[in-house]
Regions:
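C-terminal motif of bacterial Sec signal peptides marking the signal peptidase cleavage site
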Residues: 15-18
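Bacterial signal peptide processing site
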Residues: 20-23
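Post-signal peptide N-terminal segment of mature Sec-exported envelope proteins
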Residues: 27-56
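Tryptophan-anchored aromatic micro-motifs
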Residues: 47, 51-54, 59, 129-152, ...
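Flexible glycine-rich surface loops and low-complexity tracts that mediate binding to linear polymers
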Residues: 53, 90-116
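Contiguous, well-ordered beta-strand patches that form the walls/edges
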Residues: 56, 60-62, 68-87, 101, ...
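OB-fold/S1-family single-stranded nucleic acid-binding modules
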Residues: 107-135
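Lipid interaction determinants
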Residues: 206, 210, 216-281, 290-342
Length: 342
C-alpha cells in the first residue's frame, strides 16, 4: 500500500541516525510502569489531565480554547453535562470559562469536529461558569470546597494541610491525617474534621457556575454541604519544550518537534537546500511518567493521522515505531532520537 506521506516522513526516519556517543544518566529507581507500544494498542491509555480555557457550548459548535493559546479543540462533553452547561448561558454560543478533565483524540475525517486538530474527550467536569469567562489570568487553584448561607470554604494549603474559613470567624488550620482517593470519591480525615467529596454535578445557587464535585465536611460537630473542585493545575506540562535530532548527516534534513503548553505539537523537517520545510501539526499527551504520545492530524494542512510514542531516557526522547493510518512502521537505526533544547 502506497501513501503520499511516506516519502516525506516515514522514509526520512528510516534514514535518520541520531548521535550515539551520548552517555545518559542512570535512571533512578522507580515503580515499574507498563510500557506502551504502537504494535500493542491495548497498552496505550492516555492519562487524564486538566484543560482550562474559554469554551463555547452549543448544538453545532462545542469548542475550548486553552488559556494562553490561540488554538481551539473540539470539546466532547458527557451527555449528562451538555444540557446543564447550556443552562448557564443566556444566549446561544455565549463563552464560558471551563476546567475539564480528560484526554485528546484525533478528529473525525468528516463531521463537526473535522476542522480541528483534535477533540478533547471530557471524563469529568471540574468547573464551568458564565459568571466571568475571562479567568485565565487568575492563579492556579488547589482543591477546594465552597458553601453558602453563610459563606464558608475549605482550601488545601499543601498536601498535608488545609484551611477552613467561615464568614465572620477566624480561619482554622486542619492537619491531614489520612486520605483515600478513587476516580469518583475522595475522603480526607483531618485532626478535627473530615471531608467527603463525590464526583457529582453541583450547582452554585449564588452564581451561574456548575461544579463537577460535591463536598460534605463535618467540623466542630456540624455537617455542611457545598460544591467542590479539584486542583486546576495540569501536572503533565514538564514535557513541553523544543526537541531536535543532534545528528542528521545521513538523512540530509533536520527534524525538530515542539510540544506546547496547550498540548499542540509541531514536527518540522527542514532541508539544507532551502527547499520548503515539511510541517505536521497535532497534539501530545502523557501516557505515563516515562512516555509521551504525539499524534499528528495535519500533514501540510491536509488531514492525515500519524502517531509516535516517545520514551524518556535522560534528556532525550526515543520513538522506535510510527503508525500512519492503521499501519505500524519500524524506525530503523535505533529509532528517532530527539534531545530537549535548553
Amino acid at each position: 500500500m502506497t501513501m503520499s506521506r511516506l516519502p516525506l516522513a516515514v522514509a526520512p526516519l528510516i534514514l535518520l541516525q541520531a548521535c550515539s556517543s551520548f552517555n545518559s544518566e542512570s535512571p533512578q529507581s522507580a515503580p515499574q510502569v507498563p510500557s506502551a507500544e504502537l504494535s500493542r494498542p491495548e497498552t496505550i491509555t492516555p492519562q487524564t489531565y486538566v484543560m482550562r480555557g474559554q469554551a463555547v457550548i452549543g448544538h453545532e459548535t462545542r469548542t475550548i480554547q486553552p488559556c494562553g493559546s490561540q488554538h481551539q479543540y473540539w470539546l466532547e462533553l458527557p451527555k449528562n453535562v451538555r444540557p446543564e452547561a447550556e443552562k448557564l448561558t443566556r444566549k446561544p454560543y455565549q463563552p464560558v470559562y471551563a476546567e475539564v478533565i480528560g484526554y485528546l483524540e484525533p478528529p473525525s475525517h468528516r463531521g463537526f469536529d473535522s476542522d480541528y486538530t483534535g477533540r478533547f474527550v471530557v471524563k469529568q467536569v471540574n468547573m464551568l461558569t458564565a459568571e466571568n469567562p475571562k479567568r485565565c489570568d487568575q492563579p492556579l487553584r488547589p482543591t477546594q470546597v465552597l458553601g453558602n448561607e453563610p459563606f464558608w470554604s475549605l482550601k488545601f494549603d499543601n498536601s498535608k494541610q488545609a484551611s477552613f474559613a467561615m464568614m465572620g470567624e477566624d480561619k482554622q488550620s486542619l492537619k491531614l491525617k489520612d486520605r483515600k482517593l478513587t476516580q469518583t470519591t475522595r475522603r480526607y480525615e483531618f485532626d478535627d474534621a473530615n471531608l467527603q467529596m463525590s464526583n457529582k454535578l453541583c450547582n452554585d445557587t449564588m452564581s451561574d457556575t456548575l461544579y463537577g464535585w460535591t463536598g460534605v465536611i463535618t467540623i466542630d460537630g456540624q455537617t455542611r454541604q457545598g460544591c467542590a473542585t479539584l486542583s486546576n493545575s495540569d501536572t503533565t506540562l514538564s514535557w513541553t519544550g523544543n526537541y531536535v535530532a543532534q545528528s542528521t548527516e545521513t538523512a540530509g534534513f533536520t527534524v525538530s518537534m515542539t510540544l506546547l503548553p496547550d498540548h499542540t505539537a509541531i514536527t518540522r523537517y527542514e532541508y539544507p537546500d532551502n527547499s520548503p520545510a515539511t510541517e505536521e501539526r497535532g497534539f501530545w499527551q502523557q501516557l505515563n511518567n516515562k512516555q509521551v504520545q504525539v499524534i499528528m492530524t495535519r500533514h501540510q494542512q491536509q488531514y492525515l493521522v500519524s502517531q509516535r510514542i516517545f520514551t524518556l531516557d535522560g534528556n532525550k526522547l526515543i520513538a522506535k515505531q510510527e503508525k500512519v493510518g492503521d499501519i505500524v512502521y519500524p524506525i530503523a537505526n535505533g529509532g528517532l532520537v530527539l534531545y530537549k533544547g535548553e
